Regions:
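Conserved N-terminal phosphate-binding loop of PLP-dependent enzymes in the Aspartate aminotransferase
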Residues: 1-192
């Protein structure tokens, strides 16, 4: 998303893994990520230059989000849309509208919520669509797979950046995902 906008600052809510860009939120205070699944994550080894690049807000919390709205040059908002609690649809609509107005990329991290309640992501249930979407876990029915989906114009631009993986040639996850999708569709699992 930074490739697309040319801006570097990212706002997040939810848990998004152990990457430097995520842990950078705790450089100022190791409590910034406390309400995002795991408490007390240390930012040891994370470059201090990332200090003012990641900002946190809590899901469904308008007061937190007001602070995000004041950040200059925001590139992206990454949200874990649902974990324990359902999202507030009014909150999601507000975030979507804010992103549209300010040309900010909205990414839904649905690694844990995708294919739990709907065919696809939980965003389908609420009819609030991100610019990019990350799916995993249930997509492969236990096999390792993650997919990044998005608007064609964004994916085309993002393809200019380098993304790789140790297991990028491993195809069991892809095969499992295709079969999982086929079975979900064939058995109409989400129509019952």
């Amino acid at each position: 998303s930074r490739t697309i906008t040319g801006r570097e600052k990212v706002a997040i809510c939810g848990y998004h893994g152990w990457h430097d860009w995520y842990l950078a939120a705790n450089i100022k205070s190791n409590k910034n990520l406390n309400s995002h699944l795991l408490k007390g994550l240390e930012s040891y080894g994370v470059p201090k230059k990332l200090k003012n690049s990641i900002y946190t807000f809590r899901m469904n919390n308008f007061k937190d989000f007001k602070k995000i709205e004041k950040i200059k040059d925001l590139s992206t908002i990454v949200m874990e849309v649902q974990r324990e609690k359902e999202p507030d649809v009014i909150f999601l609509k507000h975030v979507r509208k804010f992103c549209n107005k300010n040309k900010i990329i909205l990414i839904f991290d649905e690694c844990t919520s995708g294919f739990r309640e709907t065919y696809g992501g939980i965003h389908m249930k609420y009819k609030i669509y991100p610019d990019m979407l990350v799916l995993g876990k249930a997509l492969g029915n236990g096999y390792p797979i993650t997919s990044v989906l998005g608007k064609k114009k964004y994916l085309k631009k993002a393809s200019k950046s380098f993304i790789s993986s140790t297991f990028w040639t491993e195809n069991s996850g892809f095969s499992a995902a295709l079969k999982t999708l086929e079975i979900i569709d064939k058995k109409k699992i989400f129509n019952s």
